[in-house]
């Protein structure tokens, strides 16, 4: 019962939540719950499960090697069953990032950080670039951030030119593309 209903708040009395003891069943349930909520790569899911394993071992004790074997077996099982697919994840992520105006460099970096293999990254970034060119992506990014021709106060465009070029460069676009977009007329 909480204080609003007239009783003490038990969560405050108990302190921090105890981690559950790891078992193959617990790890599988945790993995399925995570995959219901988030799209993930193999390495992302492994990281999540290993954090749970480490927390549990720190509290309950136990053998980390055995838990690592459980995690490896579980990830292999999920890949076999089609619940984990790095290629599908990379394709979805690359297309959504490109549609939101991200550069090729940023897309590749984000996919590599998520643990997608390099050859898959190269293929999926190339596929995304076929649909939306680098220049179109830069134009989308400039419109989102109100840079160059998309400034709300057109009179300040020339005095903010260097700042706008720098913003596009930080977003991963080349100087040539940034210059072309910033110096273009509003569409």
Swiss-Prot record:
InterPro entries: RecX_HTH_2nd, Regulatory_RecX, WH-like_DNA-bd_sf. Gene3D superfamilies: Winged helix-like DNA-binding domain superfamily/Winged helix DNA-binding domain (1.10.10.10). Keywords: Cytoplasm. The keyword Transmembrane does not apply. It is found in: Cytoplasm. Residues 1-12 have a biased composition (Basic and acidic residues). It holds the Pfam family RecX_HTH2. One of its GO terms (cellular component) is cytoplasm. Residues 1-23 are annotated as: Disordered. Its main location: cytoplasm. GO terms for biological process: regulation of DNA repair. Modulates RecA activity. Belongs to the RecX family. HAMAP family: RecX. This is Regulatory protein RecX. It comes from Myxococcus xanthus (strain DK1622).
């Amino acid at each position: 019962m909480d204080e609003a209903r007239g009783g003490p708040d038990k969560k405050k009395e108990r302190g921090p939540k105890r981690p559950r003891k790891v078992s193959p069943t617990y790890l599988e349930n945790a993995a399925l719950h995570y995959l219901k909520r988030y799209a993930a790569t193999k390495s992302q899911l492994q990281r999540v499960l290993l954090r749970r394993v480490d927390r549990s071992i720190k509290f309950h004790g136990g053998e980390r090697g055995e838990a690592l074997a459980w995690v490896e077996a579980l990830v292999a099982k999920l890949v076999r069953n089609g619940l984990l697919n790095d290629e599908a994840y990379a394709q979805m992520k690359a297309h959504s990032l490109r549609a939101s105006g991200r550069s090729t460099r940023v897309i590749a970096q984000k996919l590599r950080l998520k643990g997608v293999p390099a050859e898959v990254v190269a293929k999926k970034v190339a596929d995304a670039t076929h649909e939306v060119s680098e220049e179109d992506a830069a134009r989308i990014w400039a419109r989102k951030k109100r840079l160059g021709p998309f400034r709300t106060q057109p009179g300040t465009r020339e005095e903010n030119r260097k700042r706008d070029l720098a913003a596009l460069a930080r977003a991963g676009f080349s100087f040539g593309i940034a210059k072309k977009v910033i110096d273009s007329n509003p569409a």
